[in-house]
Amino acid sequence: MKKRLYIETLGCAMNVRDSEHIIAELTQKEDYELTQNLQEADLILINTCSVREKPVHKLFSEIGYFNKKKKEGAKIGVCGCTASHLGEEIIKKAPYVSFVLGARNVSKIRDVIKQEKAVEVDIDYDESTYAFSDFRTSPYKAFINISIGCDKKCTFCIVPNTRGEEISIPPELILQEVRRAVDTGAKEIFLLGQNVNNYGRSFSDKARKVDFTDLLRMVSEIDGVRRIRFTSPHPLHMDDKFLQEFATNPKICKSMHMPLQSGSTKVLRDMKRGYTKEWFLDRAMKLREMVPEVHISTDIIVGFPGESEEDFADTIDVVQKVRFEQIFSFKYSPRPLTPAKDYENQIPDEVASRRLSYLQDLHLQMLDSISEQEKDKVYEVYFEELKPGGYVAGRTDNNWIVKVKGSEELLGEFKSVRITKPGRLSLEGELVG
């Protein structure tokens, strides 16, 4: 009888892909099968995020809950970015945890499950040529890593300390994985990296000198690929070559994540982001000009140390000019191992909270007018998910979530949809034809 694996995934799309790799290793090469029932699992894994402080604080209460609910003899393992930076401390605080596996050590999962109190958190471990097995949480799209780690030194970010220096995965391995995904039914390819458009800079072999724009073109030339998405690009590397490929390649989805973080050049300098307010606006407005239908999302941190009212006003100015379709906004969260946590002039929580509320309220007002303009437009929607009430949901090329009345027969299909009911976060429509 097979052992049962329960896994909970927190955080970003890269964690989703890491969990897929773990599941593949254990279900295809070890005697495990996946379960959604915590209490019947023989192995319980939590794949963690450490970008902000709150999820880290929740970790120990969560694994304590798992320990109470698990069946006798079941093992608990902690994986991911929090595992990388806390390491042995996790087992010291929670001795019922069987092992700790860092974000850069996914390929070691089969070894650590056979050890007691193993801690594998080497952020210099090279997984770039590791031949991951096939497993996808969605039959309709494939998450594919194109790089591992990050070579940026943003002063607020712990990721370089949990995922290590950036290494680009060889293009031939990426294309091989894309072909396998297409052969097993995926029509949408989602390329992943901390800074995808920095791809290729780690290659020392000149014969392999491929940048992200080249890689996009190569992926798009594979038969069976209908759509290409990617996250997360860095504004600093949004050169004209990249924007031109984005605008003209019909397989590249017209949605772009542009992490602003702050609209103040002074704050951006303190964050070590490498660009200015003016650079960001130039890239965003050029993108709007080249691709009028583009959907631009962003990340914004408010309350970064030293952020004045004038600095915050600069952020609001960028928001009003770019009119982002989606904003992921947060109060600054001091992280261990980052320079910004020791900066002077930390912003009081009540000030950061006020700024966050103002930003979020402003964006909600914008969304009302942005979404209203979608009414009566016709989009091609790729349906991926059943929703309550007899609805099926999918995404447009430019990343609107659209739901229509329908059945599971729509799943995995591209259909034309006329938008009948705009909404802030999603649209409703009806099938055309």
Curated annotation (Swiss-Prot):
EC numbers: 2.8.4.3
Major site of localization recorded for this protein: cytoplasm
Keyword hit for 4Fe-4S: yes
Domain Radical SAM core: 136-371
Co-factor binding details: Binds 2 [4Fe-4S] clusters. One cluster is coordinated with 3 cysteines and an exchangeable S-adenosyl-L-methionine.
Keyword tags: 4Fe-4S, Cytoplasm, Iron, Iron-sulfur, Metal-binding, S-adenosyl-L-methionine, Transferase, tRNA processing
Domain TRAM positions: 372-433
Coiled coil (residue ranges): none
Residues annotated for [4Fe-4S] cluster 1 binding in this entry: C12, C49, C81
Subunit annotation: Monomer.
Protein family per UniProt: Belongs to the methylthiotransferase family. MiaB subfamily.
Name of the protein in question: tRNA-2-methylthio-N(6)-dimethylallyladenosine synthase
